[in-house]
Curated annotation (Swiss-Prot):
The keyword Transcription does not apply. It comes from Nocardia farcinica (strain IFM 10152). This is UvrABC system protein C. Its main location: cytoplasm. Residues 488-526 are annotated as: Disordered. One of its GO terms (molecular function) is DNA binding.
């Protein structure tokens, strides 16, 4: 890897104007493209403190061998140039929100003499118009079946079309009036194309106009006493209305908007977008990709979300307009809506809004919904994004091949003697030194073993509003492994005693008590009978050193210890000055992150429970024989603990279930407080 100092531009040579920059590797390939309001400020951030950069950004900077830039006059020009370069060079370190091929769309082959309607998955093609994407293929087929009654366009493949053209008979759809049968000349190419164009207009959102036109023709046919045509048109109107009912009305009529939401963790981001046209959700799509680029170095919270918004909108709408330019009869205004609803406005959103307006050809409004139906829909999209990220992580975690690869990668990266089939992880949780607790979670074969989870209330390393995270890690480690050390010592003494007495050697299965960690009554292993292959602490070098020191004191040498720092996802090993950096997309890092996050979740849950109990505790809790029901009855009867404290024994005994002895004990506890 290259040293960034070898290609860092000389001081004062980087301009302060807005522009776009490119990092190239030693082969001259562009590996990253970014834009900046101030090129000097942005590029200097890559070289000032390389160690503090996000791991993926750090990898990019150390992979690069040179950097170059282009100055532009406005930030809008920078947006456009950045998009063009990303599209041209396809840099490996830029996030690409490529269309998810798993989402089906309805394709219309307008580039053919007789356009065809069909369900499609795959890359976009020139001359084909697409509607969707939809969540399920059956939803497209169901809607298409309804609309073919009104718009009897061709749906067959090229081979089927040619065969029926040769035999001179239409297919079944032609006989039931769900195809205009252009294969046998029932309609001309121009008439068939007109049917397809009406179909496209309907799906594009011009629904009310189409329904009104059919109703007008229906009434005209009835007035002319052409009841057969009127009945057919009536059925067509009903079919259109049924198709419309399948698209939920979520916003006001005439509303065209895209609603976008994100869900993130330290490594990945899930994006969901709902396409609303004429107040109805016409399509939905989503992606889960690795975090990359400027967004990961923007901090957390609103700054990160704003950077993700800018990154996504620039690439997504740029590509959608490019697709529209390749498709006849589709204008940029159909893919860039009048309104884009996002969770957070990025810095300099006015320039982004101007760029989107240029793409559309008319004004585009970029805003964060605050209330009403738009806010509710934005929350729905956000829930979808969170669910997509959770499902993505669950799918990876549940895959046996991925788990096996993760364990093998961890073994190789940390130079372990064997794969860490049992991993234990510790996390500390507190609020300003109060209610300090720890959690210990267990993963076996890459899956959580929740029956072995443990909580710890920190005793020695916390108290009086202080908390020592390093000391807390040491305390938990000592409490966890002290029993293991004790059982091993007892087993060694028993073995020595047996050998000294000349006891015969017997099989382990016959004498379960001779083995450490075995319950003498059941012969089964205790839950913590075996040490972990890998012991993970949440933190960096100090926490790892504390845990390793405790294990050395206890004489436990067969447990590997590492630390996983939260933000940078660095793996710290005892005695090593530099962390181990696992590839960001590796199964090993994903598993370690999941173990750490589970320990964090479990610790927070216990911390909140302990804090809640403390905040609701009272002197009544210390009264022997006074349960929760009678404590509640006392407080309810007197209205508060203060009034109960002022009551007499006789007044307290008026409460059902409270005797004289209990009443005296209550008053004694309250006055002692």
């Amino acid at each position: 890897m290259a040293d960034p100092a070898t290609y860092r531009p000389a001081p004062g040579t980087i301009p302060v104007e807005p522009g776009v920059y490119k990092f190239r590797d030693s082969y001259g390939r562009v590996i990253y493209v970014g834009k900046a309001k101030s090129l000097r400020s942005r590029l200097n951030s890559y070289f000032a403190d390389v160690a503090s950069l996000h791991p993926r950004t750090k990898q990019m900077v150390t992979t690069a061998a040179s950097v170059e830039w282009t100055v532009v006059s406005t930030e809008v020009e920078a947006l456009q140039l950045e998009y063009n370069w990303i599209k041209e060079f396809d840099p490996r370190f830029n996030v690409r929100y490529r269309d998810d091929k798993s989402y089906p769309v309805l394709a219309v082959t307008l580039n053919e003499e007789y356009p065809r309607l069909f369900v499609y998955r795959g890359a976009r093609k020139k001359g084909v118009r697409y509607f969707g994407p939809y969540a399920h293929a059956w939803a497209i087929r169901e809607t298409l079946d309804l609309l073919l009654r009104v718009f009897p366009a061709r749906t067959c493949s090229t081979g089927v079309f040619k065969r029926h053209n040769q035999i001179g008979r239409p297919c079944l759809l032609g006989y039931i009036d769900k195809c205009s049968a252009p294969c046998v000349g029932r309609v001309s190419a121009e008439e068939h194309r007109a049917i397809v164009e009406d179909f496209c207009d309907f799906l594009a959102g011009r629904t009310d106009k189409m329904v009104r036109e059919l109703e007008r023709r229906m009434h005209a046919a009835a007035e002319d006493l052409d009841f057969e045509t009127a009945a057919r048109l009536r059925d067509d109107v009903q079919a259109l209305r049924r198709a419309l009912e399948k698209q939920a009305v979520v916003l006001g009529t005439g509303t065209d908007a895209d609603v976008i939401a994100f869900a993130t963790d330290e490594l990945e981001v899930a994006v969901q977008i709902f396409h609303v046209r004429d107040g109805r959700v016409r399509g939905q799509r989503g992606w889960v990709v690795d975090k990359s680029g400027d967004a990961v170095d923007s901090g957390t919270g609103d700054d990160e979300t704003g950077a993700l918004v800018e990154q996504f909108l620039t690439q997504f709408y740029g590509e959608q307009v490019a697709y529209a330019d390749q498709t006849p009869d589709e204008q940029p205004a159909t893919v860039v809506p009048r309104e884009v609803l996002v969770p957070q406005l990025p810095a300099g959103h006015e320039q982004l809004q101007e760029w989107l307006s240029r793409l559309r050809g008319s004004a585009v409004r970029l805003r964060v919904p605050q209330r009403g139906d738009k806010k509710a829909l934005a929350e729905t999209v956000e829930r979808n994004a969170k669910e997509a990220l959770a499902q993505h992580k669950l799918k990876r975690a549940g895959d046996l091949t991925s788990r096996s690869a993760a364990l093998q990668d961890i073994q190789d990266a940390l130079d372990l003697d064997s794969a860490p089939l049992r991993i234990e992880c510790v996390d500390i949780s507190h609020v300003q030194g109060t209610d300090v607790v720890a959690s210990l979670v267990v993963f076996e074969d890459g899956l959580p073993r929740k029956s072995d989870y443990r909580h710890y209330a920190i005793k020695e390393a916390a108290g009086e509003g202080r908390s020592d995270d390093v000391g807390s890690i040491a305390e938990v480690t000592r409490r966890r492994f002290y029993r293991l050390r004790k059982e091993r010592d007892e087993a060694e003494r028993d073995e020595l005693d047996g050998t000294a007495a000349g006891a015969p050697l017997v099989d382990d299965d016959e004498t379960p008590t001779s083995r450490p960690g075995i319950d003498p009554t059941t012969g089964r292993p205790r839950k913590f009978a075996y040490p972990p292959n890998l012991y993970v602490v949440d933190g960096g070098a100090p926490q790892v050193a504390a845990a390793a020191e405790v294990l050395d004191e206890l004489g436990i040498t067969d447990v590997a210890v590492i630390g996983l720092a939260k933000r940078l996802e660095e793996v710290w090993v005892p005695g090593e000055p530099d962390p181990v950096i696992l590839p960001r997309n590796s199964e090993a890092l994903f598993l370690l992150q999941r173990v750490r996050d589970e320990a964090h979740r479990f610790a927070i849950t216990f911390h909140r429970s302990k804090r809640s109990r403390r905040m609701t505790a009272s002197a009544l809790d210390s009264v022997r024989g006074l349960g929760a029901a009678r404590r509640t009855a006392l407080v309810t009867h007197f209205g508060s603990v203060a009034k109960l404290k002022e009551a007499t024994v006789e007044e307290i005994t008026e409460v059902p279930g409270i005797g004289v002895a209990t009443a005296k004990a209550v008053l004694a506890a309250l006055h002692q407080e």
